[in-house]
Structure formats: structure tokens, C-alpha cells
């Protein structure tokens, strides 16, 4: 979350590296780019991120019934949302590095990696939930959510910086983007799968 | 979350900058440091982070009653936990930069900034929760949690890299540390304040 200051740092590192090749004796005037130590910019970032991330509360609110009936799902929300941010962040960094080196970036390739990661992460998330006396159906939902979140995160984490790069925007900004997107998408995926696996069968049974 | 790969990148950027001064014609053999594109290291990182972040589910599980009686608190968990990661991450980056430039880093100074940030973030979190038809007492808990989380995040985000630096460990690793710590601390703070504000008064009233 809020990797803006880090990506800014990366930008500058990248730019200073580029500068290095042209004229190593003349580094960028870095001090002029620094603003995080000022109260205004720092506070503005925090306010913006808080408001965007609060969208997650709207989604959860609209699935209030599901969450009340299956409390265990809420216990694993932070873990699952974190997984999306982590896996997506990894893909962004890999993509930014490959683009910087002029290497080709293929979403299909990262989708393949995402599917391989699912083979480890989904069973792990399921076992972790089941170990905590979580009912089988809810543990399976946690595992399935881990699978969908991992695949989505690797795709978004690759496609987003590639898209930014295509539109001449620094792909490093994808680091913030993927964290915010996967925070909200993660919540939506858990709620959606919860409805599909835990609520729908009960409705059909009636 | 999982900023390890980013801080690694920063480390290398820093090291290459240092190298620049000594011998600009001989950059570090960067390729040898790269491992994130390999399945093993990437998956190991994700597994480790998932297991650490799953501690949050144990805390929530032990406050199950509170969460069931005050569902609105769970809706704002992702937003509040995100705030801790964001504010803490900002402090880490500021501290790492100051240490790199040989400037003094004072936890007291960041505590002061944290208290100023609280003046904006706590009312904002309260209003955001209250706007969503959250009961007044729960909205106040969300606001109070935002306050405590913001102050904790700025302190931990400053003290952790300073501590790492003191023990000759790269302070940049504080970026991962603060995210994981504030994920878990954030959940604990919301649960603790929820118990204090929403459960204790009811017990005394009996």
C-alpha cells in the first residue's frame, strides 16, 4: 500500500542511472524532488489512500448477511488481501525491471506463473484456515479466494505497468496501483466466492 | 506489504550510487542478485508473508464476539490496516533517506508529525464511517483506532529502521517489517479499542 514514495524513489534511482550513462558528473537535483518530509504532501497521500481503500467497506457492507453468517471469512480477509498485494507487487517489480532492460513482457507468461503459484498458495490458505477450526466449506472458500486472488494479482501486476508504459506513463506507478486495486478486488473476490459457495447452495436447497 | 523486492531494488540502487562515486565504469554485477523471477524465491516470500499475516486471523478469532456484535468494525478493518501500512511506510522511507544522508533521525520528531496527522486522519476516518450509517459509538471507535494506528505507525516506522541501522542491518528492510507489524498491530488496536469502547461500558452498565 502507498508505494508512491517508494516508486518515486525508484524513478529517481532509474533516472540517476540513466543520467549516469550520459554524464556521471552531473546528478539530478534530487532535493528539489523531495516532498514527503513536508506535512501537506504526506497528509494528502494518506487521505487519498484512505478514501480509496474505504471502498472495501462499501463492498463488505453490501455482503453484511454473508459475513454475519460466516464470520470466519472476515478473520482471513487481511491475510487474503495481503496475498493479492504481495503477489501483484512482485509482478509489478518484475515487469518494471524487464521493461527497463528492454526485455519483452508477456501477460500470458505471468498468468502461467500465477497458476503455478496457485498450486502452493491455495492449498496453504485452505490448510491454514482449516487448522483454525474453520468449517470445511468456509476453509474451501478461503482456499479458492487465495487461488483467484493470486492469478488476478499476477495478471494485473503485469498488465498495469505494461499499460502505463504503453501510454508513456512511468510503469513504476503500477506499484501503488496494484496495491489499491488488489485491496478492493481481494475483498470483492472473497465476498463473491463466499456468496457462490456458501449462500447459493443453501438457496437452491430450499 | 512484501516490499522486500522493492527494498532489495533500493539497496542495489543505493549500492550502485555508492559505486558510482568510486568507479563509475564498473557497475555491480546486478544480474547475480536477481532472484524474484525464479519460482522458488518468489513462492517462498509469498508463503512466509501469508503465514505471518495469518496471525491477524488468530487475533480476530479471539474477539469473535465483539466482531459479531459490531459488524461495522470489520467493514473498516482493511481501510484502517491500510492506513497503518501507509503512514508507517512513509516514515520508513523518510528515515532511510535521512540515515543515508547522515542526517539525525529522532523518533520524538516523527511522533510530533504523527500527532499532527492524527488531527486530520482521525476525524476523516470517523466521518467516513459515520457517513455509511455506522452507529456513533462504532464510528468513534474507527476514528480512535485511526488515531492510535497513525501514531504507532509513525513511531514504529522511524524506530524500526533506526534500530536495524544501529545493529548494522540495512534500514531499508524496515519497509517490509513495518507493513507486517502494522498489519497485525492494526487488527489488535481495532479489537482492543472496540473492547474498551463498545464492550466494557456495557459490562459496567449491568
Protein language model features and the residues they cover:
Chain A
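Juxtamembrane helix-loop transition segments at the membrane interface in multi-pass membrane proteins
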Residues: 16-22, 33, 63, 68-72, ...
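Hydrophobic alpha-helical transmembrane segments of membrane transport and translocation systems
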Residues: 154-206
Amino acid at each position: 500500500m502507498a508505494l508512491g514514495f517508494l516508486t518515486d524513489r525508484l524513478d529517481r534511482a532509474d533516472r540517476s542511472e540513466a543520467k549516469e550513462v550520459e554524464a556521471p558528473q552531473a546528478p539530478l537535483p534530487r532535493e528539489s524532488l523531495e516532498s514527503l518530509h513536508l506535512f501537506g504532501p504526506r497528509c494528502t497521500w494518506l487521505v487519498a489512500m484512505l478514501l480509496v481503500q474505504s471502498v472495501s467497506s462499501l463492498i463488505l457492507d453490501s455482503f453484511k448477511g454473508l459475513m454475519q453468517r460466516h464470520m470466519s471469512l472476515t478473520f482471513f480477509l487481511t491475510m487474503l488481501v495481503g496475498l493479492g498485494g504481495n503477489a501483484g507487487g512482485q509482478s509489478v517489480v518484475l515487469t518494471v525491471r524487464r521493461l527497463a532492460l528492454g526485455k519483452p513482457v508477456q501477460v500470458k507468461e505471468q498468468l502461467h506463473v500465477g497458476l503455478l503459484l496457485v498450486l502452493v498458495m491455495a492449498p496453504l490458505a485452505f490448510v491454514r484456515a482449516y487448522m483454525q477450526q474453520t468449517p470445511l466449506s468456509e476453509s474451501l472458500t478461503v482456499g479458492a479466494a487465495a487461488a483467484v486472488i493470486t492469478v488476478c494479482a499476477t495478471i494485473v501486476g503485469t498488465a498495469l505497468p505494461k499499460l502505463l508504459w504503453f501510454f508513456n506513463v512511468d510503469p513504476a506507478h503500477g506499484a501503488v496501483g496494484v496495491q489499491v486495486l488488489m485491496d478492493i478486488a481481494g475483498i470483492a473476490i472473497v465476498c463473491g466466492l463466499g456468496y457462490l459457495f456458501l449462500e447459493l447452495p443453501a438457496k437452491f436447497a430450499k
